[in-house]
Structure formats: structure tokens, C-alpha cells
Amino acid sequence: MYNAEKKQPTYWQRLKIAFQYVMPQLYLTLAAGWLAKQKWGSVTHFIIKLFAKKYRVNMQEAEKTEFKDYASFNEFFIRPLKADARKIDENPTALCLPADGRISQYGHIEQQTLLQAKGHSFSLVDLLAGDTELAKEFEHGEFATIYLSPRDYHRVHMPCDATLRKMIYVPGDLFSVNPFLNEHIPNLLARNERVICVFDTEFGTMVQILVGATITASMSTVWAGIINPPRSAEVKEWTYSGESAVQLRKGQEMGAFQLGSTVINLFQADKVELANHLDVGVPVRVGEVLAYKK
């Protein structure tokens, strides 16, 4: 696990942090969601082109490489990739990374505490919406957090074959989750809106969490569709068994963000060993090795 001495923010950085607390997070997010759905023809194509240029989006790996082929910004943002754009590691003892992005944090869960960033830890119980029994399953386990920037591919995939046990929607804040704010806003990942997916796998119980953020207009899964909006003020839980059981294969798409955010994976103690090439800030891609079976 990575941890280093935390630098004090500058005056302008403190203003940036303060703005996160006072800005109308929900209204900005709703407005962004509405705008991203609009189909304005050449205006939409121009906006997409500007965005792709600013963030250096690699359009050659997308199924549709031309900006004019996207009717809305949302359609562009969750663009599928060509079939050969991501290679899924075929080693049966390996779990794969679920998303493109950068490693934000990773390592050992100390009892029921995860490292968020330099100088900040947060409670596993808080992250799991107060579910103490579920949290106990991951005491002394392993975790990995991936930050998806605006330029990244925003569909989320499965690290391994799995059976969905339950899904939990947790209402919360909509702070930005970029690396700077992740370092300076306490408990950020346990405060933000999120969708918790609990899976049974040959590697033990695995949790994969989609964390929302400012202007993340919606999160979706392949089995339930769009989870939010509408946004609930209460925690919601769905269980899956029998006829409603959901089976997913390694590398299969399981969800998506409409605008960027964060994915967190949790593994039980003594079940997996995180790959030694992982490091904070390192860019990663879907299908690369995340961990190996112990």
C-alpha cells in the first residue's frame, strides 16, 4: 500500500477544495446529464470533437471512429471499443482489471480500514453503507481503487467469472473524485453516491463498487439498466437468486458511467495476491492482471 507525507495545499488549492463543499453538486450533475443527452446534430459533433481533442481521446480503438456517428455526448462517452481493443488475460488463476484508468490506491485492508490517499483512510463499514456483516467478510483482505479520467473508456468489466449475490444503491454526495480532491476531502469515497455489487466467485466473495461524482449523470449495470437517476434518499438493496440469478464471465461488461468516476474492488483475506506491477498513478487497462489466486 502506498502512503507518503502529505503536502499542504496552496491558497488557490484550498479555494478549490472549499468550492466542492458549497457548489450545487446535484443541480450541476442533473444539468450535465440533461446536456449530455441532447441530440443537436453538428453542434453535438463539434462539442465531442473539442472534448476528444482536449483530453486526447483515442478514437481509433472505438467501434465508431467518426465524431459524426454519435448522436449525443452520452453515446460518445460510453462508446464501445473494437473487439480486439482490449485483451483479457486468459490465465485461469488471474483476475483482470475491470476498468481503464489509473491506480488511485491499492493494498491490504487493515482490519476494516482502507487507504483513500496520502493522509486519509476511510471505514469499510461506511463504504458498504453500514453493512457490518458484509464488512466482516473483508477484514484483512485486499483492495484496489481505479480512477477513470474524462479521456478513459467508461464501461466496466468483470475481473473473473462470477454470480451476482446482491446490489446496493447508496445515496450520497457528488464530490469530484480527481486525484487532488481525493487527497484533500476526508472519507470522499465513502461519502459519494455509489452502487455496490457483491459477487460469489472461485476467488471468494468479491465486491465491485461504482462510485459517482460531480457530473456523473448516471451509473448503470447490464442486468438492471440505469440505476440513477432517479436518485433515492434511501439505501436500496436487490438480491439475486434462483430465476433472477445473474451469471457473468471474466472480461464481460457489467456496467458503465455516463461521465467519469471510480471503481473499487474488495477481496477476502488469503484469497488473492495483488499483482506486483500495481502502483499509485500507474495507467491500467481492462483485461490486464489485477491479482492472482493464492
Curated annotation (Swiss-Prot):
Disulfide bonds: none annotated. One of its GO terms (biological process) is phosphatidylethanolamine biosynthetic process. Is synthesized initially as an inactive proenzyme. Formation of the active enzyme involves a self-maturation process in which the active site pyruvoyl group is generated from an internal serine residue via an autocatalytic post-translational modification. Two non-identical subunits are generated from the proenzyme in this reaction, and the pyruvate is formed at the N-terminus of the alpha chain, which is derived from the carboxyl end of the proenzyme. Keywords: Cell membrane, Decarboxylase, Lipid biosynthesis, Lipid metabolism, Lyase, Membrane, Phospholipid biosynthesis, Phospholipid metabolism, Pyruvate, Zymogen. The modification Pyruvic acid (Ser) is found at residue 261. It is found in: Cell membrane. Its EC number is 4.1.1.65. Pathway: Phospholipid metabolism; phosphatidylethanolamine biosynthesis; phosphatidylethanolamine from CDP-diacylglycerol: step 2/2. The keyword Lyase applies. Transmembrane segments: none annotated. It is a peripheral membrane protein. The active site is at 100 (charge relay system), 157 (charge relay system), 261 (charge relay system), 261 (schiff-base intermediate with substrate). The record marks 260-261 as: Cleavage (non-hydrolytic). GO terms for molecular function: phosphatidylserine decarboxylase activity. The keyword Lyase applies. Heterodimer of a large membrane-associated beta subunit and a small pyruvoyl-containing alpha subunit. Catalyzes the formation of phosphatidylethanolamine (PtdEtn) from phosphatidylserine (PtdSer). Belongs to the phosphatidylserine decarboxylase family. PSD-B subfamily. Prokaryotic type I sub-subfamily. This is Phosphatidylserine decarboxylase proenzyme. It comes from Histophilus somni (strain 129Pt) (Haemophilus somnus).
